[in-house]
């Protein structure tokens, strides 16, 4: 599931930058669409990282895993939060005043954010995911992992819709291996109304 989430993050960051660079001068409607989709990405990524900070890193610390690695993960999360905030501010400026100059500045801010985000995701996939794979059958790990889920069924449905939007077959297969396909289909079609209404049209 972690790599499915990471793929969705990478995808949204990339297409946000592309959308900003292609934004016609003065197109406020499109700028607000981009801002809405970016806000969804920030919301999903914030939930993902707060869940890791509150659950995974303390769990691994108690198990005696490398404290320097865990400190690096937390530090990278702080850097990502700052980069996301800077990009959000720049995108808000475009939504308020959709000039080519503001769009270019926002695209550059998203590009800078992308470098921070991708460096962290690569680091986590390289050094933390192998640990997680080793612990898949650990009962305490399984109990902790339940705390990573979204707070409500609606939040879960919107997250699933986001993960699938633009996903390749590899990500979709991985998702179906974790959650039964019919469950994913029902939640995405009938419960994920916010995502389908507010975000999905941005990327069509």
Predicted regions and their residues:
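Small-residue-biased structural context
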Residues: 1-204
